[in-house]
Amino acid sequence: MLDLKRIRNNSNEIKEALNNRGEKFDVTVIDEVLKLDEERRNILAKVEVLKSKRNQVSSEVPKLKKEGKDVSNIVAEMKNLSEEIKGFDATLAKIDEKIQYIMLRIPNIPNPQVPDGETDEDNIEIRNWLEPTKFYFEPKAHWDIGTNLNILDFERAGKVTGSRFTFYKGLGARLERAVISYFLDTHTEKHGYTEILPPYMVNRTSMIGTGQLPKFEEDAFKISEDDYFLIPTAEVPVTNLYRDEILKGDELPLKHVAYSACFRSEAGSAGRDTRGLVRQHQFNKVELVKFTKPEQSYEELEKLTNDAETVLKELGIPYRVVRICKGDLGFTAALKYDLEVWMPSYNRYVEISSCSNFEDFQARRANIRYKEDAKAKPQYVHTLNGSGVAIGRTVAAILENYQSEDGSVTIPEVLRPYMGGREVIK
C-alpha cells in the first residue's frame, strides 16, 4: 500500500508512474482518494474544535456546581456536542473504509531503476551463466524423460486429482527431496538465513498483507467456510510472521528461508507451459524473505538475488538474470529480477525465481515497523523476497540439461550426498 501522504504531495508523479505500468490502471482513483482524504481532514478539524469546546464546557461544570448554579443548560450543550462528534465519527469511519478500499487496489510505484517497457519482451538481460546446453542428439522434454524413467506420473495424477498435478515416484521423489534439502542447507549454512516451516493455510488478513488480495483472489485456492486460503507461496506466512509488530533496528536485516508446498489456480494460463512440471496447481518451493531498513533494501536485494543464483551455479544449470520492465513488474514489486533457466525442450529460458524489493508497500499493508531505539519513532521496514528456488522447475531443468541419449539422467554432483551417492538415474 502506498503512503497516502506521498500521494497527497506528489499526485501527478504518482499518476505518471501508474500510467507507465503495463496493466491498465484507472488513475482517476488517485483524485478520488485525494477528495476523500480532504473531506476526512476537514471533518477531523471540525471534530477537534468540537472536542476542545466540549472539554472547555465540561471544565466549567464543577465550578458552577460548587457555586450552586444551575448546570442543566451546560450538560445539555455537552450532550449535543457529544452527539455531533459521534455523527462525525460515523462519517469518518465510512470515509476511512472507502479510502482503504481504494488504497488496497493501487499497485506499487516502480523504482527509477526499472526499465521502460510493456511486456516480458522488453525485460533486460543483466547477466548470464554458462552457455545453453548443447546435445549431439535430439533432447527430450522433462515430462517424457520422467515418464520413461518411471519417476514422474502425470497420467495417474490426472486420474486421482486432475490436470497439472504430478506423482513423484521412487528416485523422482528422492530427487525432489534432495533438491529441497540442498537448497535449505545452502541458504541456512552458507547464506545465514533462519529456517521457517510455515502453515500452508493463512487467513484473509495475511493475504491482504502481502498483496495477493484483493487483486488476485481468483488465483487463490480458498477454504470458504473458514475464509482460509492455501498459500500461493511461503512469502505470505513468513512476511506476516511480523504483522502488527515493531522490530528492533539492530535485528535488521532479518533473513528467513522457508520450504513449503504452494497452491495456485493459474487462472488465465491455459496453453502456457501447462505440460510437465513448469506450471502446476501444487508445487514445492524454497522461499527467501528479508526485512530490512529502507537504506539497506537495495543492497540486500542484490545479495538475495546472488543467494538464489548460487544454487543454480552449483547445480551447473545454465541461467540468466533479467531486470523486469515496468509493464511486466506485477502489482507489489518496486523492482524485480527474474532468474531464468535454460530448458532445451523449450529452446528458451524459463523463469525459476523472482527476486523483488517491495520497499514499504507490504509493510504498510501488514503494519510491520521497526525502531532504532526505545525513544525513536517507528518506521516501516522494507520487505524483500525471492524464490531460492522453485523445486519442480529445478527438477525439470536437471532432467533436461543432464539427460543422456540412452534416456538416463546424470545427477548433479552437489545433490549426490542427498541421493545416497547415486550418480545416475536410469
Swiss-Prot record:
GO terms for biological process: selenocysteine biosynthetic process; seryl-tRNA aminoacylation. It is found in: Cytoplasm. It is an enzyme of class 6 (ligase). ATP binds at R264, S265, E266, E351, I352, S353, S354. Keywords: Aminoacyl-tRNA synthetase, ATP-binding, Cytoplasm, Ligase, Nucleotide-binding, Protein biosynthesis. L-serine binds at T233, A234, E235, E287, S387. It catalyses: tRNA(Ser) + L-serine + ATP = L-seryl-tRNA(Ser) + AMP + diphosphate + H(+); tRNA(Sec) + L-serine + ATP = L-seryl-tRNA(Sec) + AMP + diphosphate + H(+). InterPro entries: aa-tRNA-synt_IIb, aa-tRNA-synth_II, aa-tRNA-synth_II/BPL/LPL, Ser-tRNA-ligase_type_1, Ser-tRNA-synth_1_N, SerRS_1_N_sf, SerRS_core, tRNA-bd_arm. Its EC number is 6.1.1.11. Pathway: Aminoacyl-tRNA biosynthesis; selenocysteinyl-tRNA(Sec) biosynthesis; L-seryl-tRNA(Sec) from L-serine and tRNA(Sec): step 1/1. One of its GO terms (molecular function) is ATP binding. The keyword DNA-binding does not apply. It comes from the Bacteria. Catalyzes the attachment of serine to tRNA(Ser). Is also able to aminoacylate tRNA(Sec) with serine, to form the misacylated tRNA L-seryl-tRNA(Sec), which will be further converted into selenocysteinyl-tRNA(Sec). Consists of two distinct domains, a catalytic core and a N-terminal extension that is involved in tRNA binding. Homodimer. The tRNA molecule binds across the dimer. Belongs to the class-II aminoacyl-tRNA synthetase family. Type-1 seryl-tRNA synthetase subfamily. HAMAP family: Ser_tRNA_synth_type1 (MF_00176). This is Serine--tRNA ligase.
